[in-house]
Swiss-Prot record:
Gene Ontology cellular-component annotations: cytosol
MF terms (GO), sorted A to Z: rRNA (guanine-N7-)-methyltransferase activity
Name recorded for this polypeptide: Ribosomal RNA small subunit methyltransferase G
Organism, as annotated: Clavibacter michiganensis subsp. michiganensis (strain NCPPB 382)
Top class in the EC scheme: transferase
Subcellular location: Cytoplasm
Family: Belongs to the methyltransferase superfamily. RNA methyltransferase RsmG family.
Length: 211
């Protein structure tokens, strides 16, 4: 018999971050933890840290979103796109993902979790630049900020925002992207730290406005 998959216990902070959506978040996390490695969505080391490193890390971005249409680039397993859609039913999401098996997983979870605010588009970001006029765009662990700018800005309306999850090198990535920031007319570029005092691993976001 295969060894049972051990999923990290739900952190106490999860309930306050998801509010009345916590049951949906629990179901998604259970599904991803039990089936994610088999489907090639997460690695074998992830279930024991699934809540803290992935789900909580993603949901901390939810307060930065505003009602409208948000695109998530390279959604993969649904991080952060599905997690944010669970936490913010008042926001519409389009999850943009090129890999067929990941798209199948996302579509299955959208139906299973009854997420009426989510659509899934199988494509690369650069292939759908003319299709969308997003209010905001998110991405997590996709590429360096300088490379993400030309992929994401064409999807966003004037006055819209990039809300891109980054690691501890966020400030350096912003410095390295100075040419792209000017070329693509980004303003109010800032690094925001989320979760201080709530979680052990904070979430860093680069936020910028498309002028």
């Amino acid at each position: 018999m295969p060894e049972p998959i051990i999923i990290e216990p739900e952190p106490a902070v999860a309930g306050s971050l998801f509010g009345d959506r916590i049951d949906v978040a629990r179901e998604f996390t259970a599904q991803l933890g039990q089936r994610g490695e088999e489907l090639g969505l997460i690695g074998p080391l992830e279930p024991p840290r699934l809540w803290s490193r992935h789900v909580i890390n993603s949901v901390l971005v939810a307060p930065l979103l505003r009602p409208g249409l948000v695109g998530d680039i390279g959604t993969g397993a649904g991080l952060p796109g599905l997690v944010l859609a669970i936490a913010r039913p008042d926001v519409d999401f389009v999850l943009i993902e090129p890999m067929e098996r990941r798209v199948a997983w996302l579509e299955e979870q959208v139906a299973h979790l009854a997420l009426g605010n989510v659509s899934v588009r199988r494509a690369r970001a650069e292939e759908v630049a003319q299709e969308f006029n997003l209010d905001q765009v998110t991405a997590r662990a996709v590429s360096a900020f300088a490379k993400l700018i030309p992929l994401t800005v064409p999807l966003v309306k004037t006055g819209g925002e990039l809300v891109l999850m980054k690691g501890s090198n966020a400030e350096r990535e912003v410095e390295a992207a100075s040419k792209a920031i000017r070329k693509y007319h980004l303003e109010d570029v800032e690094v925001i730290t989320l979760g201080s005092g709530q979680v052990d691993e904070v979430t860093r976001v680069v936020r910028a406005r498309v002028a």
